Amino acid sequence: MPQYIPIMLNCEGWRIVIVGGGRVAERKVSSLLAGKAEIVVISHKLTPWLKSRHTEGVISWFERGYIEGDLEGARLVFATTDQAAVNEAVIMEATALRIPVNHAGDGEQGSFITPSMIRRGKLIIAVSTSGAGPRIARSLCHEIDKQYGDEYETYIDFISNVRAFIKELVPDGSQRQSLFKLLAEMDILTEIREGNFRPWSEEEITSWISEYREV
C-alpha cells in the first residue's frame, strides 16, 4: 500500500477535470468549490445537484463521454465513472501528462487520494486511513464533527485577523512570537460559546498589541 503525504493545495484558478457526473463526482465537486478552481465535469448526465451548479455557472459541463485530450491544461484530475475502461483511460492520460489523478473506485490506481474532511471556515480537519478503510475515516470524521462546532469558525477568524495585525505592526521576530503565544492562550472560545464575544475593532487590536508587545 502506498505511503501518502498530507498536503494542503491552493487551487484557485486551477483547471480541475472530473470525468463522471454521478454521486461520487458530486462529492468531489462539493469539496472543491471552496478552492475557487475552474471545475470541468465531463459526463453524458449529471445529478440534479451538479446540474444546479452548472446552471449557476459554478462548474463547466461537457455533455458527452471522455475522449483522449480532455485533460490538456488540467492541474488535477478525478476519474469517477462506473466504467472501468474509461477510468483506466483517464488514469493513463493523466499519468502520461504528469497530472495528479485520483481514481475514486481504487485509490491505488491513481497518484493521490482525498481524505474525509470537516470544514469550519478557515479550519480544516482532514482524516484518512490511507485508503485502508474509507468508512472508518468517515466514522472518525463524524465523531470529530461533534467536538468542533461552528464556534471554531468565529474563533479562527478572530485569531487570523489579530495575527495579520501583529505581522504588519511588529517587525521584531521574538516580539511577534510572544504575541502569538499570548493570543493562542486567550480563552476566546469560552467567550464565544457563552455568547459574550464580539469581534475586536482595529483600535482594540492595535491597543492590545501596544500593551503586550513589550511583555
Predicted feature residues:
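Hydrophobic, well-ordered beta-alpha structural blocks that scaffold small-molecule cofactor pockets
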Residues: 1-45, 50-53
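Residue-level detector of alpha-helix initiation sites
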Residues: 23-24, 85, 131
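Hydrophobic beta-strand scaffold residues
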Residues: 39, 61, 100-101
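Short loop/edge segments at beta-strand edges and connector loops
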Residues: 43, 61-65, 105
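Glycine-rich, highly charged phosphate/nucleotide-binding loops
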Residues: 52-72
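ADP-ribose/adenylate-binding Rossmann-like module
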Residues: 76-82, 87-113
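E1/E1-like adenylate-forming module used to activate ubiquitin-like modifiers
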Residues: 103-153
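An accessory alpha-helical subdomain
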Residues: 131-215
